[in-house]
Each structure stands twice: as C-alpha cells, then as structure tokens.
C-alpha cells in the first residue's frame, strides 16, 4: 500500500474540507450522545452508529492520505453505504426527542449523512467522470486522467516521428550507393552506426539486394519494426497492469517516467527505464 502523506490531504481542498466537516460532525454527535445518555434513555444502536462512523472517517482519511481512491473506491462506497443507513436511523430516532442534547446528536448525524452522500458520489464515480476530474484538478498532489484523457496533443515538440510505418526498408545496390554503403540502409536497424562495418559484411547480412527487397515487401505487412527513437517523455498519472493476453502491452506504476516514440492515437509506443517496450494507454500518461 502507498505511504500515507499529510500533504495529499492538505493539498486537496475537497479532501481537507470533507474530512474536517466529518470530524466536526462526529464530535457533535459523540459529545451530544454522551450528554443525552446521561439525561435520558439514549438508543443503544446509535452508539454503534457513532463507533462505526469513527472507523469510516479514519478509513477515508487514510485513503485520501495515501491517494489510493482508485484502488479502494469500491470498498469505501460499500462501507459508507452501511454508515448512511446507520446515521439515518439514528436521526429518525433522535430528531423527534424533547431533550436538546438528543436533537444536537441528530444534527451531528445529519451532517455526517450529508458528507457520506458526497463521498459516495465521489468514490463511486469513474476517474473519467467530469465532476471527479474537476474536483481533482484543484489538488496539488493529484493528477486526474479525466483532465487529460480528451485533451488535444501538444504540437510544441514538432512533428512526430514516423516510427510505426509498416513498409519494408528500401534496399540499394552498391552501384546506386556509389561508395556510401553502410551496414544498414536505414538508421536504427541492426548493424550499428554508418561506417561501422565494411562492405563485405553488409553484403553478407543482406545477401542479394533484389531478393531481400522482394522478401521484405511480402513480409512487411505482417511485421512492424520496433522504433529506435523515443523523443518524448511521459509521466504515468495512474498505475496500469498490462493485459496478460496481449503481449504488446506493458505495465507501469504511478509517477513512473516512460519514453514515448509515437503520441498519436489512444495507445502510445513506450519504453520503460529497464528497456522493456510496448504500448500504453494514452489516458494514463501525460507528456512532460
């Protein structure tokens, strides 16, 4: 589990406001319940609501502090739904009491119920939801995929390299090259830098140029050459687990820096720091 950081709460206005209001509401309900229990017959199950909501507030605070809302969102919604039932039942009993302390406890439970409804709406929504992206946009230490999922690609980096071409590399004869032969007719393909090998090794590698060209044209549509240049860098705003049935996908963790060669479409060709290459969903990444 991610480490708890107070800055995740202090830097998030939504988390700071809702957690603060929930703590205040719980204190009102708890203190008023103690006073009401001394003066009158206080319903026993309302104490369970007080204890249960204390645990829920602690749990939500930990989720906000560790920034794991996407991981534990479903569990949080389930626990909060139970808490909403308990606080509503407590309000229904206490709000009609004659004792002012019981009515104050009911007010605390009403405020707790309102915060619970807001939390359920937040954690129960997908990260791409408009309202969640808007809320997360105010956080200093959180980046929402919804804010970048549909944004236009920046043109500040110039035209993207054509690294995903399916056409086979053009082969030339020695007469056409007129002494400018290299070990590879296209930079980045096996053979190293230009001039690193002599002409004989180039002929041994490619054999008959015309035969290689025919073979390349036949197989070029089936095999996609891997790009060798990754001019862009992207930061992962969410963790992603690759589909085990798709060997082309790669997994990465949140805040990991990836090198990207192609920034068109919904899937980007990327390379990790350990050299692993594959495709990654663009709405999980943001260009640096």
Curated annotation (Swiss-Prot):
Chain coiled-coil ranges: none
Cytoplasmic side, ranges: 1-14, 66-70, 125-288
Biased composition (Polar residues): 197-221
GO terms for biological process, alphabetical: regulation of actin filament polymerization
Signal peptide location: none
Location of the region described as Disordered in the Swiss-Prot/TrEMBL record: 183-227
Gene3D superfamilies: SH3 Domains
InterPro entries: SH3-like_dom_sf (IPR036028), SH3_domain (IPR001452), Sho1_SH3 (IPR035522)
Topology versus the membrane: Multi-pass membrane protein
Domain SH3 stretches: 229-288
Protein localization: Cell membrane
PANTHER family xref list: FCH AND DOUBLE SH3 DOMAINS PROTEIN (PTHR15735), HIGH OSMOLARITY SIGNALING PROTEIN SHO1 (PTHR15735:SF20)
UniProt subunit comment: Forms homooligomers.
The protein, known as: High osmolarity signaling protein sho1
The gene coding this protein: sho1
């Amino acid at each position: 589990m991610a480490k708890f950081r107070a800055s995740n709460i202090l830097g998030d206005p939504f988390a700071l406001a809702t957690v603060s209001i929930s703590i205040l509401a719980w204190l009102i309900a708890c203190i008023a319940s103690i006073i009401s229990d001394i003066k009158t017959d206080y319903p026993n199950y309302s104490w369970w609501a007080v204890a249960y909501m204390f645990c829920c507030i602690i749990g939500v605070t930990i989720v906000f502090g560790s920034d794991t809302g996407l991981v534990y969102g479903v569990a949080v919604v389930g626990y909060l739904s139970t808490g909403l039932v308990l606080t509503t039942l407590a309000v229904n009993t206490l709000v009609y009491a004659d004792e002012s302390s019981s009515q104050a406890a009911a007010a605390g439970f009403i405020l707790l119920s309102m915060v619970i409804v807001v939390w359920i709406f937040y954690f129960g929504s997908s990260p791409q939801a408009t309202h969640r992206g808007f809320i997360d946009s105010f956080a200093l230490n959180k980046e929402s995929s919804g804010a970048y999922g549909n944004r236009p690609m920046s043109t500040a980096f110039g035209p993207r390299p054509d690294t995903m071409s399916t056409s086979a590399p053009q082969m030339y004869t020695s007469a056409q090259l007129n002494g400018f032969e290299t070990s590879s007719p296209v930079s980045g393909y096996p053979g190293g830098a230009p001039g690193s090998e002599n002409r004989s090794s180039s002929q041994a590698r490619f054999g008959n140029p015309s035969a290689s060209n025919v073979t390349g044209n036949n197989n070029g549509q089936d095999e996609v050459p891997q790009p060798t240049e990754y001019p862009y860098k992207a930061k992962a705003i969410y963790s992603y687990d690759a589909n085990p049935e798709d060997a082309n996908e790669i997994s990465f963790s949140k805040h990991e820096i990836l090198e990207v060669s192609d920034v068109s479409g919904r899937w980007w060709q990327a390379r990790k720091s350990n050299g692993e290459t594959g495709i990654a969903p663009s709405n999980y990444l943001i260009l640096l």
